[in-house]
Amino acid sequence: MKREAFKMYLKPGYEAEYEKRHAAIWPELKALLSKNGVSDYSIYWDKETNILFAFQKTEGEGGSQDLGNTEIVQKWWDYMADIMEVNPDNSPVSIPLPEVFHMD
């Protein structure tokens, strides 16, 4: 199982809305992530920088960042685009973070 971390950017003033939308994550999106080996997925917010830090475990080759070709993920991106920094296709600007330490 791989561990992956990445950062994204939340627009200022949208912290509560971001949490609200994720508290009601679509069941079909959650099922897609699970079906594709994504587990132990957490997102943290740095209130000083509005950086979102995401961590997930993945089985196989892909992770949540590799599901952008699916209709449900594209709809989620569109739904979140007004409150996050996004690319032209509405995918969140996402920067992978290398692991520099791990302890079991």
From Swiss-Prot:
Keyword terms of this UniProt record: Carbohydrate metabolism, Cytoplasm, Isomerase, Rhamnose metabolism
GO molecular function: L-rhamnose mutarotase activity; racemase and epimerase activity, acting on carbohydrates and derivatives
Entry's EC annotation: 5.1.3.32
GO biological process annotation, one example: rhamnose catabolic process
Localization in the cell: Cytoplasm
Xref: HAMAP family: L_rham_rotase
Role according to the record: Involved in the anomeric conversion of L-rhamnose.
Enzyme class: isomerase
Organism encoding this protein: Bacteroides thetaiotaomicron (strain ATCC 29148 / DSM 2079 / JCM 5827 / CCUG 10774 / NCTC 10582 / VPI-5482 / E50)
Family the entry assigns: Belongs to the rhamnose mutarotase family.
Catalytic activity: alpha-L-rhamnose = beta-L-rhamnose
A GO term from the CC aspect: cytoplasm
Positions annotated as active site in the UniProt record: 22 (proton donor)
Pathway: Carbohydrate metabolism; L-rhamnose metabolism
Pfam family, one: rhaM
Subunit (UniProt): Homodimer.
Entry protein name: L-rhamnose mutarotase
Binding-site residues, substrate: 18, 41, 76-77
PANTHER family the record matches: L-RHAMNOSE MUTAROTASE
InterPro entries: Dimeric_a/b-barrel, L-rhamnose_mutarotase, Rham/fucose_mutarotase
